[in-house]
Amino acid sequence: MIETDRLIVPTAVGPQEEQIERALRPRTLAEYVGQAKAREQLEIFIHAARKRSEALDHVLLFGPPGLGKTTLAHIIAREMGVNLRQTSGPVLERAGDLAALLTNLEPHDVLFIDEIHRLSPVVEEVLYPALEDFQIDIMIGEGPAARSVKLDLPPFTLVGATTRAGMLTNPLRDRFGIVARLEFYSAEELGYIVHRSAGLLQMNLDEAGALEIARRSRGTPRIANRLLRRVRDYAEVKAGGEATGAVADAALVMLDVDRAGLDVMDRKLLGAVVEKFMGGPVGLDNLAAAIGEERDTIEDVLEPYLIQQGYLQRTPRGRVATPLAYRHLGIATPASDAELF
């Protein structure tokens, strides 16, 4: 699978990386870099909730993977001075799984559900009254003797995170009082994050090295920190531990991450659209078959950055390569395509 062998995939690739991420994670909103709009809103809402001694309204965080949704959930709990209970949509298979979590919450605690779009309908039905009225219905007994018992819950905050907000049901989406979309980071913001992480890793990294890593990190802090660790390895072996701009560039070229932040899979996808399908439009199923990947992987992992950077367009008829894609691949843009753009 692409997630396990791709250096610039935005999802976490294992327990070891998750452990490193936790060590590098900012602990407060003051330390959190980027997402200025979401950060400002959360600062105000958290301050107001604490001033009134209330639970924070339920929060929905959505956007591409690796942008800091889990980090923000931890920060929200820390800023509120409460406990955080963490789970994910696929883990909550039965209504009882959710009920066990909810009944163990303390007042104002934060319950973080990652991949909340993957909750089962049965679990969602239990969640609705919990979010709205802080109550749940529990079935006691079995068969004809079974009866429903209503349990009161302490006021709590649900923080839901998703990469696919469009898959949330309307009733669930409507129960979030605070909705924040996380955007890709600028090179300057990522440079600051890389510098901070380098300090925590006790690594010698100059400004040019940080910028070289930042501009190849696809606007994603998780990728930036991963590339930083690989540059550190290269610098320690090849450059006496000094990660300059030239050293970072050499390390990333060795890793097949080009100066636009594209890797072999990105170039393979763009090459397929340009060379096998004459620039498009090409349907998603045909494209998936051409490069040997699942359509969900293309939609969720490969496409977002290519579209955001202007290499690819998604049209009603299929995917179309832009002149920028042709230039990046070193292929002349057909005259008919050049006229379209």
Swiss-Prot record:
One cellular component term from this protein's GO annotations in UniProt: Holliday junction resolvase complex
CDD domains the record matches: AAA (cd00009)
Keywords assigned: ATP-binding, Cytoplasm, DNA damage, DNA recombination, DNA repair, DNA-binding, Hydrolase, Nucleotide-binding
Enzyme's top EC category: hydrolase
Region Small ATPAse domain (RuvB-S), annotated ranges: 186-256
Entries under PANTHER family matching the protein: HOLLIDAY JUNCTION BRANCH MIGRATION COMPLEX SUBUNIT RUVB, PTHR42848
Function: The RuvA-RuvB-RuvC complex processes Holliday junction (HJ) DNA during genetic recombination and DNA repair, while the RuvA-RuvB complex plays an important role in the rescue of blocked DNA replication forks via replication fork reversal (RFR). RuvA specifically binds to HJ cruciform DNA, conferring on it an open structure. The RuvB hexamer acts as an ATP-dependent pump, pulling dsDNA into and through the RuvAB complex. RuvB forms 2 homohexamers on either side of HJ DNA bound by 1 or 2 RuvA tetramers; 4 subunits per hexamer contact DNA at a time.
Domain-level remarks: Has 3 domains, the large (RuvB-L) and small ATPase (RuvB-S) domains and the C-terminal head (RuvB-H) domain. The head domain binds DNA, while the ATPase domains jointly bind ATP, ADP or are empty depending on the state of the subunit in the translocation cycle. During a single DNA translocation step the structure of each domain remains the same, but their relative positions change.
NCBIfam families xref list: PRK00080.1, ruvB
UniProt name for this protein: Holliday junction branch migration complex subunit RuvB
Lineage per the UniProt record: Bacteria, Pseudomonadati, Pseudomonadota, Betaproteobacteria, Nitrosomonadales
